[in-house]
């Protein structure tokens, strides 16, 4: 059973000083910069971008 390198094995949360364990906006235990494309446009012309404060990829608010 291997432990994720970003995960504190005792509490299974990001290690001290690190931001995240996984997610489309998490790389090497840190949030990707705000404005990094996390989901390319698929026909609607709108891409989704990382916020720089969460490992999730929020839906572009202009997508309807």
Curated annotation (Swiss-Prot):
Motif (Cell attachment site): 42-44
Source species of the chain: Echis carinatus (Saw-scaled viper)
GO annotation, cellular component aspect: extracellular region
Protein's name according to its UniProt entry: Disintegrin schistatin
Protein purpose: May bind to both alpha-IIb/beta-3 (ITGA2B/ITGB3) and alpha-V/beta-3 (ITGAV/ITGB3) integrins, and may inhibit platelet aggregation.
A GO molecular-function annotation: toxin activity
Entry keywords, A to Z: Cell adhesion impairing toxin, Disulfide bond, Hemostasis impairing toxin, Platelet aggregation inhibiting toxin, Secreted, Toxin
Residue span, Disintegrin domain: 1-64
């Amino acid at each position: 059973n291997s432990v994720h390198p970003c995960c504190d094995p005792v509490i299974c949360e990001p290690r001290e000083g690190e931001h995240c364990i996984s997610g489309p906006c998490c790389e090497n235990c840190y949030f990707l910069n705000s404005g990094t494309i996390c989901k390319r446009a698929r026909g609607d012309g709108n891409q989704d971008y990382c916020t720089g404060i969460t490992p999730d990829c929020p839906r572009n608010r202009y997508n309807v």
